[in-house]
């Protein structure tokens, strides 16, 4: 694992290359990630850097959280995340410090994790890309139903994992292999090629790609 950043999805746009090719990109705003805790093998059994970002009203912060943030000497954030790291990656990191967009470089490939948009209860056609049944030719009412879900007496049941209608979306999704096409250090913004999970305004985690 490696240190990453917690950011916020601002939306999508496009940029043009020197050859005039339109490239779809996603803009990610990265407020300074404040280090709230450094975990080590001696104290916690594993090595990690814990960060917080954004702001939260004091009335929405529990006493335990207040004590944790006060001990680190940082303002209370809207969330807390941690990144597993190696001994080398801990060098130069200290509690109360910050991590910004300078962690990455233009052209670097990253993985982005977010919470996908919730779609509610959906049928098999939308959820699993099932084909529809005939629109006519004697078919009525059953145009978008699943059809048969199994066999007869043997095995006499529907197998676990059978693709059926159900809740779609609102789950943790990671998109791998996205290239950073631009970094605006002044505005603390990352611009990555392609789409990332979640709705505009949602929190995302940007890490160096695991498939280097």
Curated annotation (Swiss-Prot):
Signal peptide: none annotated. InterPro entries: Ribosomal_uL3, Ribosomal_uL3_bac/org-type, Ribosomal_uL3_CS, Transl_B-barrel_sf. Methylated by PrmB. The modification N5-methylglutamine is found at residue 153. The keyword Cell membrane does not apply. The keyword rRNA-binding applies. It comes from the Bacteria. Part of the 50S ribosomal subunit. Forms a cluster with proteins L14 and L19. PANTHER family: 50S RIBOSOMAL PROTEIN L3, LARGE RIBOSOMAL SUBUNIT PROTEIN UL3C. HAMAP family: Ribosomal_uL3_B. This is Large ribosomal subunit protein uL3.
